[in-house]
Amino acid sequence: MRTNMRYDGIPFRPVTVSKVSDRPRLVILTDVSLSVRATARFTLHLVHGLQSLASSVRSFAFVSDLVEITDLFAEHPLDEALGLVVAGLPAGGVLDVDADSDHGAAFGTFLEQYGSAVNRRTTVIILGDGRNNGRDPNLAAMEEISRRARETVWLTPEPRYSWGLGSCDLPAYAAYCDRVQVVRDLAGLERANDARTEVAQ
């Protein structure tokens, strides 16, 4: 209307405003190593369900190497896609699932190859136990991912008392997360889903 005031209030040219969706974008990084594989299956089911809550979802699986699995969900039935993720390279899978966990290497690869996927509209969800088997946790990469994101959420099957034991670097990673939640079963994932829905609304 303000634009049309110069024409004595007579509508002359319609003025439209493009409405931009405020639904968040999701990036999910899922550890599928042996120690968290059962939980990873549940989480990948959750990822599939979350796609309707976000303007875009990009999904990645890692052990030490990291691969994008977004297209697997688009091109295959869910159970078949899950099989391709966890089957391992000898069985025609997309990832060496028998390697030792290396979150630091995976985060570095993600930042180098896919870092542009994260911006201030992106919520990053990480599933992992934070165990690097003595390798460099690459906190600089974790910090940079978190800095770029709208929110960083870490889901872990590890009980809190074990976070500082052995090769677990989760306490260090937690410093760069907005929320860390213990998820060990379907009920825990449902609670995480409820919290994620609140963020998306």
Identify the residue ranges that each predicted region occupies.
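Short acidic, S/G/P-rich loop/turn micro-motifs used as interaction or catalytic elements
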Residues: S35-R37, L66, R131-G134, Y161
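Negatively charged sequence features
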Residues: M1-P24
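A short, conserved beta-to-alpha structural element at the edge of catalytic cores
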Residues: L50-L72, R148-S167
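…and closely analogous acidic/polar surface helices at protein-protein or active-site interfaces
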Residues: R23-P24, T30-D65, A74
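Von Willebrand factor
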Residues: E80-T122, P159-L165
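Von Willebrand factor type A / integrin I
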Residues: E143-Q201
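Short beta-strand-loop
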Residues: F62-G88
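Exposed acidic/Ser/Thr-rich ligand/metal-binding surfaces
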Residues: G104-E151, Q181-V183, A195-Q201
